A protein has these predicted regions:
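Fe(II)/2-oxoglutarate oxygenase catalytic core
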Residues: 1-123
Length: 127
């Protein structure tokens, strides 16, 4: 069994990404990034409150194959494919309002990676 460390795209097809989108975008190309950056202190304050809430707010990322050690990538979801996670959005009203102001936003979350852990190279359908 060989290991595939290349860029992969889908839950079902772990082959190389075949799309035409860039791997990274320049934030300066999007007007809404300035609004998020200008409000980073509010976002950070709400994140700190969630983290102080303990492990019940952090969930292991659902796709264990994307990390070198399971349970090391943790997430707090706000939106996933347009579905709003009210549990977290209600605790972070400023962050939620900022996210909802992003045109075309489908998915958003806070993410944390344990020290000495690795997220494998990938390109998903929302980045």
């Amino acid at each position: 069994m060989s290991s595939n460390n290349g860029i992969w795209y889908s839950f079902f097809d772990r082959g190389n990404f075949k799309g035409s989108e860039p791997y990274f975008y320049n934030p300066a190309d999007f007007e809404w990034t300035k609004h998020l950056e200008a409000n980073w202190l509010d976002i950070r304050e709400e994140l700190d409150q969630l983290i102080r809430g303990g492990d019940q707010n952090m969930q292991a990322y659902f796709d264990k194959a994307m990390v070198d050690v399971a349970q090391t990538w943790k997430t707090i979801p706000f939106f996933w494919w347009g579905i709003k996670f009210n549990k977290y959005c209600s605790q972070t009203p400023k962050t939620t309002a900022l996210l909802e102001s992003v045109p075309g936003m489908l998915s958003a979350s806070f993410n944390m990676l344990d020290g000495n852990s690795v997220i494998k190279p990938h390109n998903g359908d929302t980045n």
